[in-house]
UniProtKB/Swiss-Prot annotation:
Disulfide bonds join 47-65, 55-469, 58-83, 68-94, 211-218, 266-307, 407-419, 439-467, 471-491, 471-494, 481-494, 499-528, 511-526, 520-531, 533-546, 553-567, 561-572, 574-583, 585-609, 593-607, 601-612, 614-624, 627-630, 634-661, 640-657. The chain crosses the membrane at residues 685-704. Residues 471-495, 499-547, 548-584, 585-625 form the I-EGF domain. The gene is ITGB8. It is a single-pass type I membrane protein. The VWFA domain (or beta I domain) contains two cation-binding sites: the ligand-associated metal ion-binding site (LIMBS or SyMBS) and the metal ion-dependent adhesion site (MIDAS). Unlike in the other beta integrins, the cation-binding site adjacent MIDAS site (ADMIDAS) in ITGB8 is not functional due to the presence of two Asn residues instead of 2 Asp residues. This domain is also part of the ligand-binding site. Heterodimer of an alpha and a beta subunit. Beta-8 (ITGB8) associates with alpha-V (ITGAV) to form ITGAV:ITGB8. ITGAV:ITGB8 interacts with TGFB1. Residues 43-684 are extracellular. Keywords: Calcium, Cell adhesion, Cell membrane, Disulfide bond, EGF-like domain, Glycoprotein, Integrin, Magnesium, Membrane, Metal-binding, Receptor, Repeat, Signal, Transmembrane, Transmembrane helix. It comes from Homo sapiens. Residues 1-42 form the signal peptide. GO terms for biological process: cartilage development; cell adhesion; cell adhesion mediated by integrin; cell migration; cell-cell adhesion; cell-matrix adhesion; ganglioside metabolic process; hard palate development. Placenta, kidney, brain, ovary, uterus and in several transformed cells. Transiently expressed in 293 human embryonic kidney cells. SMART domains: INB, PSI. This is Integrin beta-8.
Length: 769
């Protein structure tokens, strides 16, 4: 609600100011608007709460703030409060004519307009901190542009069939492009890769002919060669293409981006015309090297983005890196060049993924032997001229642009996305919002450029910052532009006509508690080298650096200082009978932390609400009394222990006792309790562990033996079922089976008496083992 109200409030000011009705009617209208919107009653009135001591500092707080320059303006009978929103200043008795409130102006000169595609060509904007300005930018595409089309072809061996197709594209393409342009020109250039290892073979037999292994006559590899400047002579173009030979390299990626940058920036060599639509057609079937790839060849010098053609050959190919995508995009946009990637094979998607990073580019897939090349160029051109996008160049520090495109079909899109399907009869509008957040920006440029991508016209936006007041310039006698309650005579200087601050004499560093800390702890403003702290509804902010307050103390159960104390400088000052960092503990609770020696937590902790919290992590116990590894007082003063029994001591030792050990004579006491837990006999512990281990082992052996005996007993019982007994008279007939004898032992084998008559077995029953 507050944001929309403020926007409406500011917009009304701008409109009224542009009507030039004078300051009185303007500020009276501002007062009415602020009363209606209730801004004067808002909880977050940063104007009044800031304690701004000058008009400039007041206006820098936000677009709703005004400054009263009236000399006798007094609020509350104590001191001047000149910074507030307009409605409050008027209600406090400040006359309308005495209120400083610079408005936002957008000035569009109508005379001397030379642009035909982008209007207005120039805009002048006056801004104040926190305010924003709006204007409309119109872009109207022309019907028949002059067109410059430059073919940049990958002439590696795999592109042989596509290069042959170029011999016949000239006339056919000229006829098709005549529908879109009355003035069409063609140019040609070739590229391969950097002529160093590992990109090409440097073998003596292959250095000049990379195709020698295939019995082909190839031209030497090269980074980029400009073959033919842009010309209307189609026959000359076809002859240049016909003379072109293929070349070769080793690795798969090519040096396309290197060649593209040179073709873009070498304007005079290529013959780019300022008034023409510039198209760069890149034909390839492989990816391109990116920045840093050339480090593999020991090339570490970054690409400088300049033209380096000598005799139409790129001479820095082996000494400078490939350009980055960002650098390439910048050079293409700066030179108004649209790129068409004509890619054959599976690498088409690689280039398609790059389109969002290269504004004004299109990718198309060419068929075998480039049969669809002309149609691809025509379709790409139609798409390019039907898209209208803008971007901001030459950004001004501290100034922010928000651009929305209003397309012919009524849809709204972000400026970088732009509009599509725009015809030569359409007009695209761009709603431009310019915002300045603060005034503490010095130096730099004071204008920005809004550039439609691919167009040769731009809009220049001049920015003027309203960061000072008229009273500080020439109107104000003493007291109008400043609040003297914050200042001293060394900083605040006035003459008969005006007052000003000698801010160079007082550095803001004096308002910092430390060089890494914000000015006035971020809770005040630095005026004449002193902090003026903000007024906050939560409480009082004070201190030399506004570092103290009476509201940021810790809470306990929802109450500041548990309700048992007051907050001073961020620390709780407890009432009588209470203690603790939050005043949450009764003072009597401290008695529960005193040990038998009268020490609080044995000197190794702090008492928190009747319980010891050991500060030494080695201490344990209710009173932190146990600390096996602590360095005890006896150890620290062991050399002085003999002073407690001075008999038979030498004079030197007695002198030492009187000096370094004198304090101990007054404070010593005998501690009869052990610092450590009582330690049992190690030998006894050893024998106990040994006996227990032995008994456990013996028990395991007995259990295992019993299990084995039980298992054997069960097996003997089961074998008794197979006893065989026979009388001497009986005859046992053996079956024709083969058996093996198995011998095993047991503790008490049971005898088995068997009487088996012998039989003569037939040979067929004999067993062979």
């Amino acid at each position: 609600m507050c944001g929309s109200a403020l926007a409406f409030f500011t917009a009304a000011f701008v409109c009224l100011q542009n009507d030039r009705r004078g300051p009185a009617s303007f500020l009276w209208a501002a007062w009415v608007f602020s009363l209606v919107l209730g801004l004067g009653q808002g909880e977050d009135n940063r104007c009044a709460s800031s304690n701004a001591a000058s008009c400039a500092r007041c206006l820098a707080l936000g677009p709703e703030c005004g400054w009263c320059v009236q000399e006798d303006f007094i609020s509350g009978g104590s001191r001047s409060e000149r910074c507030d929103i307009v409605s409050n200043l008027i209600s406090k008795g400040c006359s309308v004519d005495s209120i400083e409130y610079p408005s936002v102006h957008v000035i569009i000169p109508t005379e001397n307009e030379i642009n035909t595609q982008v209007t207005p060509g120039e805009v002048s904007i006056q801004l104040r901190p926190g305010a924003e300005a709006n204007f409309m930018l119109k872009v109207h595409p022309l019907k028949k542009y002059p067109v410059d089309l430059y073919y940049l072809v990958d002439v590696s061996a795999s592109m042989h069939n596509n290069i042959e197709k170029l011999n016949s594209v000239g006339n056919d393409l000229s006829r098709k492009m005549a529908f879109f342009s009355r003035d069409f020109r063609l140019g040609f250039g070739s590229y391969v890769d950097k002529t160093v290892s590992p990109y090409i073979s440097i073998h003596p037999e292959r250095i000049h002919n990379q195709c020698s292994d295939y019995n082909l006559d190839c031209m030497p590899p090269h980074g980029y060669i400009h073959v033919l400047s842009l010309t209307e002579n189609i026959t000359e173009f076809e002859k240049a293409v016909h003379r072109q030979k293929i070349s070769g390299n080793i690795d798969t990626p090519e040096g396309g981006f290197d060649a593209m940058l040179q073709a873009a920036v070498c304007e005079s060599h290529i013959g780019w015309r300022k008034e023409a639509k510039r198209l760069l057609l890149v034909m390839t079937d492989q990816t391109s090297h990116l920045a840093l790839d050339s480090k593999l060849a020991g090339i570490v010098v970054p690409n400088d983005g300049n033209c380096h053609l000598k005799n139409n050959v790129y001479v820095k190919s082996t000494t400078m890196e490939h350009p980055s995508l960002g650098q390439l995009s910048e050079k293409l946009i700066d030179n108004n060049i649209n790129v068409i990637f004509a890619v054959q094979g599976k690498q088409f998607h690689w280039y398609k993924d790059l389109l969002p990073l290269l504004p004004g580019t299109i990718a198309g897939e060419i068929e075998s032997k480039a049969a669809n090349l002309n149609n691809l160029v025509v379709e790409a051109y139609q798409k390019l001229i039907s898209e209208v996008k803008v971007q901001v160049e030459n950004q001004v520090q501290g100034i922010y642009f928000n651009i929305t495109a209003i397309c012919p079909d009524g849809s709204r899109k972000p400026g970088m996305e732009g509009c599509r399907n725009v015809t030569s009869n359409d007009e695209v509008l761009f709603n431009v919002t310019v915002t300045m957040k603060k005034c503490d920006v010095t130096g730099g440029k004071n204008y920005a450029i809004i550039k439609p991508i691919g167009f040769n016209e731009t809009a220049k936006i001049h920015i003027h910052r309203n960061c000072s007041c008229q009273c500080e310039d020439n109107r104000g006698p003493k007291g109008k532009c400043v609040d003297e309650t914050f200042l001293d005579s060394k900083c605040f200087q006035c003459d008969e006509n005006k007052c000003h601050f000698d801010e160079d004499q007082f550095s803001s560093e004096s308002c910092k508690s430390h060089k890494d800390q914000p000015v006035c702890s971020g809770r005040g403003v630095c005026v004449c080298g002193k902090c003026s702290c903000h007024k906050i509804k939560l409480g009082k902010v004070y201190g030399k650096y506004c570092e103290k307050d009476d509201f940021s103390c810790p809470y306990h159960h929802g109450n500041l200082c548990a309700g048992h104390g007051e907050c001073e400088a961020g620390r709780c000052q407890c009432f009588s009978g209470w203690e603790g960092d939050r005043c949450q503990c009764p003072s009597a609770a401290a008695q529960h932390c005193v040990n038998s020696k009268g020490q609080v937590c044995s000197g190794r902790g702090t008492c928190v609400c009747g319980r010891c919290e050991c500060t030494d992590p080695r201490s344990i116990g209710r009173f932190c009394e146990h600390c096996p590894t602590c360095y005890t007082a006896c150890k620290e003063n062991w050399n002085c222990m003999q002073c407690l029994h001075p008999h038979n001591l030498s004079q030197a030792i007695l002198d030492q006792c009187k000096t370094s050990c004198a304090l101990m004579e007054q404070q010593h006491y005998v501690d009869q309790t052990s610092e450590c837990f009582s330690s049992p006999s190690y030998l006894r512990i050893f024998f106990i562990i040994f006996i227990v281990t032995f008994l456990i082992g013996l028990l395991k052996v007995l259990i295992i033996r019993q299990v084995i005996l039980q298992w054997n007993s069960n097996k003997i019982k089961s074998s008794s079922d197979y006893r065989v007994s026979a009388s001497k008279k009986d005859k046992l007939i053996l079956q024709s089976v083969c058996t093996r004898a198995v011998t095993y032992r047991r503790e008490k084998p049971e005898e088995i008496k068997m009487d088996i008559s012998k039989l003569n077995a037939h040979e067929t029953f004999r067993c062979n083992f």
